[in-house]
Amino acid sequence: FVGCGVSGGEEGALLGPSMMPGGSEESWKTLKPIFESIAAKAEGEPCVTHIGENGAGHFVKMVHNGIEYSDMQLISESYDLMRRALGMTPAEIGDVFEEWNKTELESYLIEITADVLHQVDKKTGKPLVDVIVDHAGMKGTGTWTVQSALDLAVPVTGIAEAVFARGLSGQAELRAEAQKQDFEGPSGVVPMAEEDKVAFINDIREALYASKIVAYAQGFNEITEAAKVYDWKIDLAAVARIWRGGCIIRAKFLNRISDAFENGEANVSLLFAPYFKDAIETAERSWRRVVSRAITFGIPVPVFASSLEYFDGLRSPRLPA
């Protein structure tokens, strides 16, 4: 028996996906040359490995999708802050994402976000993003990731808030009724000097990276706990390596994640590995400014905020729960 999670969509089908097979070692020995021949390649290595026994492969693919939800919601919140608070156009925001893709944030999702924000709708002449209905659908894997985390008692707060954000976007009637209520609260572009605007954009970049690290830390924590409960032997460094190509969340910093697990630096949490600990501490003040200012501006940032709250919960010597 083999259950294989496959990521990459249409492009992966054509150019090679990231594959996460689960099942017996004997089955893997038979299928390995076939899977390695069709998988995507990253730095010359095939993006496929035997994940573990039974349903381990599909479980890891499920968590991959949960992380993807969080990743995309963080990008959306970054866009929303620049659009609503700073009054930037989609094309201007696309330029920002292009620059961010030259930094530690380099990833497929940042790249395609920049591309989409530069697109213009041919029929209306408006930015394409402005003619897309703001109701996000779900296929279920993000929900399953959260449900499984609840069963395992593992907090995946960023992923959960990303799922709920999609759920709220789909509550069309409720949202329409809320607009009629004309609730009190801040709205509109925030007057800001150019140098302050530039500084805030940099704060958003820092907050995005810190929150992204938390999303991956939470996802890998869920995989770790599931491996204990279901008696799977999962090589987390190998999982990070096969996500470097072919899949939706492929990103530059997956090399850092792989190294952290390989070196034993992330055995308890990815956040404790020296590189990621330093990155979080470097971004911490920017992260707090983004969340606090978003609240002041009346702009929802559920994944930014929940990721910061998770970090603060971890570092608290005593919790009131």
Region spans (language model):
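C-terminal amphipathic alpha-helical interaction region
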Residues: 281, 286-321
